[in-house]
């Protein structure tokens, strides 16, 4: 199984070790699924960790490197423009499409989750994903 994990889920996995988002990343670490990310997602991760959380550059780079090592990195070619309010969210959708993933996992309840799917790819929250694929967690 292949998944794209939105930036907000990556950040949650760093903040709440052992939490739901971290359980998703643990599935990747354990080899139970593949995570597909794009350069945009990694750059956005670095930007948020630097600007919002004010982490030092070394800690930010360490986090980005960790996810980059775990992930398959794709370069989306198709342009998606379905989210008008926050256009950068379209880059997450493009990654999922380019990676031919089975699920897009996000915590974005305002822009991404309401879409429910994109080009046949289900869009789900972390808890929903874990309930479906790891009952009992």
Predicted features, each with a name:
Residues 7, 39, 107-109:
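Short secondary-structure boundary segments
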Residues 1-2:
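Residues that mark the start of a beta-strand
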Residues 83, 90, 97, 102, ...:
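Acidic, PIN/NYN-like endoribonuclease modules and their adjacent C-terminal/linker elements
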